[in-house]
Amino acid sequence: NTISISGYHIREAGSTAVQEIAFTLSNGKAYCIAAQKKGLDINQFGQRLSFFFNAHNNFFEEVAKFRAARRMWAKITSELGATDVRAQMLRFHTQTGGSTLTAQQPKNNISRVTLQALAAVLGGTQSLHTNGYDEALSLPTEEAAKVALRTQQIIGYESGVTDTVDPLAGSYFIETL
């Protein structure tokens, strides 16, 4: 990717889900405008942009955040002149929220990370990093790293959520968030 636009650190610093998306997409729009001022075609460079988001604790809010961000980015790029669908796509990576992990009962973080990861997948993330359950204490141990990997594998291969492109499409609750 030519440019990766990050909102992860914004959320880790205490922003809301809405602020994370607002600032990150605004940064992306600023990159697009700057590139266009230099004569670059958004249909060419737009498909090389990627984003990096945080998955936090409020499950449904996170799913809705990612879904809304995808629609908003398509609208932003379209308004900037993108006609190629690939240039309008929000390609993004998600990492589970490090600031949500607790040191007092680290194994409870397994559930937190699992729900955050599932929210990201249901929201349409293209790649995912799951934090180790003990990262509130130190660098993840080998066991914690393995649990984080297995969490992704269970979601991807055993839960069935990846069997359809958009399993929550049409959900009144998600759409109204």
Give each language-model segment a name.
Residues 16-24, 36, 65-69, 78, ...:
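Peripheral terminal and linker regions in Fe-S/redox and tRNA-modifying enzymes
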Residues 76-78, 102:
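Outer-membrane beta-barrel translocator/pore domains, especially the C-terminal barrels
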Residues 14-22, 56-68, 96-110, 138-147, ...:
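Short glycine/threonine-rich loop-to-helix capping motif typified by GTGT followed
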Residues 1-56, 61, 80-83, 88-93, ...:
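Catalytic alpha/beta active-site cores
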Residues 26-33, 106-125, 147-156:
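Glycine-rich and small/hydrophobic secondary-structure elements
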